[in-house]
């Protein structure tokens, strides 16, 4: 597994483990919203597969994946929809930084931990950012 993909898989595993210690009566589904700029290309397909595999290890975790198909306008609308669905965590791989910045800030200010992958936004209002450098 490539180093960047290992980080993503570990991230999903770590977040899932945070919510696996509750009793049955306390458990609720932990929903991870994933906003991908595109699902084309082997790297992005591998990343998504790794996320799905890791999430499947935890019955209390589900992934909601959105493919923006290289459209920043579509990505903004999809992220807005994920916010309205009250995801517990939002992972964003922005198509372009500038158009996605306001909606990413909105998610962060709504109390949704917001993780940026592969591309930063034009703000420091996010939880963490994972950038791969060779």
Kindly give the residue locations of the regions a language model identified.
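Bacterial N-terminal signal peptides that target proteins for export
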Residues: 1-8
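C-terminal motif of bacterial Sec signal peptides marking the signal peptidase cleavage site
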Residues: 17-20
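Bacterial Sec signal peptide processing site at the extreme N-terminus
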Residues: 22-31
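Extracytoplasmic "Venus flytrap"
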Residues: 33-54, 58, 63-81, 85, ...
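Periplasmic-binding protein-like
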Residues: 87-94, 115-117
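Catalytic-core regions built around general acid/base machinery
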Residues: 98-111
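A short acidic, helix-capping loop that chelates divalent metal ions and anchors anionic groups
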Residues: 123-127
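Conserved small/polar residues in nucleotide/adenosyl-binding loops
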Residues: 132-133
């Amino acid at each position: 597994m490539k180093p960047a993909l290992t980080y993503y898989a570990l991230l999903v595993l770590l977040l899932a483990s945070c919510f696996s210690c509750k009793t049955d009566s306390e458990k609720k589904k932990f929903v991870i919203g994933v906003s991908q700029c595109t699902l084309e290309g082997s790297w992005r397909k591998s990343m998504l597969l790794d996320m799905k595999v890791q999430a499947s290890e935890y019955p209390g975790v589900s992934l909601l994946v959105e493919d923006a198909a290289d459209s920043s306008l579509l990505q903004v609308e999809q992220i807005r929809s994920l916010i309205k669905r009250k995801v517990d965590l939002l992972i964003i791989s922005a198509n372009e930084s500038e158009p996605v910045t306001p909606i990413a800030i909105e998610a962060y200010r709504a109390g949704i931990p917001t993780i940026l992958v592969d591309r930063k936004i034009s703000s420091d209002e996010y939880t963490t950012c994972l950038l791969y450098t060779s």
